[in-house]
Amino acid sequence: MRTYRDVIKVKDIILPYIEFTSTEFQLLLNRFSSLEVNAGSLKGSFKYNLSYKDVKTHFGLGGVHGAASKGVYESDDKMIIMSSDVTSFYPNLAIKNRWSPGHFPKDEFCDQYEWFFNERKKIPKSNPMNYVYKIILNSTFGLSNDEKSFFYDPELCLRITINGQLTLMMLYEQIMERIPGAIALLQNTDGVETMIPREHINLYMDICKDWEEKTNLNLEHDEYQKLVLADVNNYIGVNNYVDVDITKWREIKQSQPHYLFKVENDKFSFAPVKLKGRFDFHNLQLHKNKSKLVIPKAIYQYFVNDLLPEQYLDENKNILDYCIGG
């Protein structure tokens, strides 16, 4: 059970609602529409670089990636860093548009795919089963480009990844075109980070709502206090504080010690901290290299807690943080 194809004409698989207003993105759409891809070899089948609003964004089979210049970006009284991610982006593109491998009945495939998505929503992220369902959802897309898999259909793979990139860029373009003073920070496979004037937060949310209605997808929003940016794959994001009860506060402090915590006037709050790429050190998966963890920990302490590296190194007596694997 597999679907083999010869040539995929990309113009035939682009969603009808995809449209842009800027010259840069109209050229991108024209470029994608002109592609005819060898279905037997999708890897490296399309690459495109686009410069827009002083940020270079890269497109390819692996997704869309773009980042502003490296630096530390912080929210203040006038500006706020907004992060908006699409909920289970690639799986939901297939579910909402009723896409399936050519050899599967569409309704049965999409209904079962949606069942896994809905089951995952019922499980807290702290529960390992949430991660299991995440892998099931994401690997189903990935296996559509694996000839050894019974999900194999290169057109489905290309349909999801190209429409995913174009759809996300519609949101990115509208934010940048319609919000005066908006600053692009990150564009990744399933979301965008943008610094905008606080006075335009309602406009930002309206743009996101319009996008959700057009695409039938959902966005999850966060606000960052600070974004320490090296590149699109390596950064630290410090969210705003969230108030919780003392029981939840203690639970989160135990499971996520790298978050920020505070108690003021008997109010308990925490600020999630996202660690990506080489800055990550918390609960690394078994296949990840745990060598020299003292380095990302020292960087974290410096940028998040204003602790000088020499002071942190003097205080950190955990010998495992200094070990190097062979």
Language model features with spans:
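Conserved acidic
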Residues: 1-326
